[in-house]
Regions:
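Iron-sulfur-associated redox domains of electron-transfer enzymes in respiratory
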Residues: 67-181
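Iron-sulfur cluster-binding cysteine motifs and their immediate structural context
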Residues: 2-9, 15-45, 50-70
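Alpha-helix N-cap/helix-initiation motif
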Residues: 13, 48, 162-166
Length: 181
């Protein structure tokens, strides 16, 4: 991968304040580059970035961006592509009076099915219990957060055997929907 090729990248608003570097848990995920006009900016090393989002929160200049496929999503809906959505329970909690309207708009736009990720959490819980019981696996790391898994994979590989071999609730839900619905 390399510069600006991952999920997170730097845009032209960077003023090299280094706040992104100071909050990043992965020292090798950011580096300074000299641009053709003589100015500098901090780039994201796509292979090292774990996409945790800390730099987004720290940057007051909105110099960090991410690959956004929202436009493609709506284009696909217009073309009639059958799309199902998995919605995090936090969405309903954050928008308790509006979430039904938002989901209704998406359904009217052509979304085939809308499912709560809590459904995937039930599958994940079953898979954890099943794995622990069948393999007598104690002291494992059960982590549905991709940023933590990416961090372990890239920076502490000796912990890989401790990661529970179970997908996140989102992935379990998506796999079930794709296979059975």
């Amino acid at each position: 991968m390399g510069k600006n090729t991952g999920l997170v990248y730097t845009n032209e608003k960077c003023i090299v304040c280094n706040k992104c570097i100071s909050v990043c848990p992965v020292p090798s995920a950011n580096y300074a580059v000299k641009l053709a006009d003589g100015s500098s900016r901090i780039e994201v090393e796509g292979d090292a970035c774990i996409s945790c989002g800390a730099c987004f929160d720290a940057c007051k200049h909105e110099a960090r961006s991410y690959r956004d496929d929202t436009e493609q999503f709506f284009q696909d809906l217009k073309k009639g592509v059958k799309i199902s959505l998995l919605i995090a329970p936090a969405f309903m909690a954050n928008y308790p009076t509006e979430y039904q309207n938002y989901l209704g708009i998406l359904k009217a736009a052509g979304v085939h099915r809308i499912i709560s990720v809590s459904f995937g959490a039930d599958i994940t819980t079953w898979a954890y219990l099943n794995y622990i019981s069948n393999h007598k696996f104690l002291g494992g790391i059960s982590q549905p957060c991709p940023a933590v898994v990416n961090y372990i994979e890239r920076n502490i590989p000796e912990l890989l055997p401790k990661l529970m071999p179970v997908h996140s609730p989102l992935m379990c839900g998506a796999m079930y929907v794709k296979k059975y619905m």
